[in-house]
Amino acid sequence: MLLLAGLPVRSQLVKWTPEDIKLLTKDWVGERLPDGRPKVSDAHLERLKKVTIEEAWEFLRAKGYENQFENFSGTNENSWVIIHPEQEMIGRVLTAQYMPMRFDFDDYLQEVGKKQGINRVNNNLPVTSLSEGDVYVADAFGKIADGTLLGDAVGATVFRNSKRGVIFNGSVRKLDALAEMEGFNAWVRGFDPSSISGLVCASVNAPIRIGRVTVLPGDVVIARLSGVIFIPPQFVTELILSVEVTALRSTFNQQRREGKIDNNTQFNEWAIKQSDDLHISKAELEAYLNQQASQPQSTQQTRSQRQ
């Protein structure tokens, strides 16, 4: 038995099993998708629209997760491009790893794939694995020419299955047609007229690297003009509540200064009464406020000791 990043690996898997994914994402307590990935709720994905990249970055950094953001600036040598820069994309991550073609390795992958019930291991495999709310995230080692992981036909299937788009450390083709596809978006290394060639799909739903980020299946991604940030699913609820409570506290302090709130009123008492106007249940908000009041400030120190 081999060990990979602390995980028991019986053999190379093309598509990681639900059991492997559950072990990989053991910190998640909640519903899972049939393939084993954490299923952050659609309601939480909606609430993340009000969370800025900076707020998410600061929250994760305080948790000791310092490598969750990838810059999409077009002014550096590692720049990326976005089909619709004005449109954000938020969803649950499905990962794929592509590697340079090596025929004996590809033969091996096809044999392993057959044992997993996969008829053919190619760039269609991740696409057929998508479900609504997923974002297809793939590492193709920055390949642009011949690294076109999809065109308009596969792009249409991606959107039909996920209602989202893609984030590729690789490229796409048929940009004009993709740009006309309402609701579809892509964060990629570039565009190229070539068809995909010289690549093998080495894994689906395994850990991959996107720029400076290690991405796990089931992460939640926020993709915007400035870049992409990958949020471990176990932190999503706390992040949202942190941002929403900070906004509540700002409103509370402002209304206190204006004399709209009595000086004897405590924030927690007032905040719980406001929960009906937010996407927060009273129980959820109350539990978070109590947790914040009693939580020791040791998380960052504990994480830092791993470095």
Predicted regions and their residues:
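Feature captures the catalytic cores and cofactor-binding loops of soluble hydro-lyases/lyases
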Residues: 48-55, 59-217, 231-280, 284-297, ...
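Buried hydrophobic positions in well-ordered alpha/beta secondary-structure cores of metabolic enzymes
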Residues: 36, 158, 219-221
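Channel- or pocket-lining gating/hinge segments that regulate access to a cavity or pore
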Residues: 226-229
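N-terminal pre-domain segments of enzymes
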Residues: 12-57
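Short, solvent-exposed loop/turn segments at the edges of secondary structure
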Residues: 203, 223-224
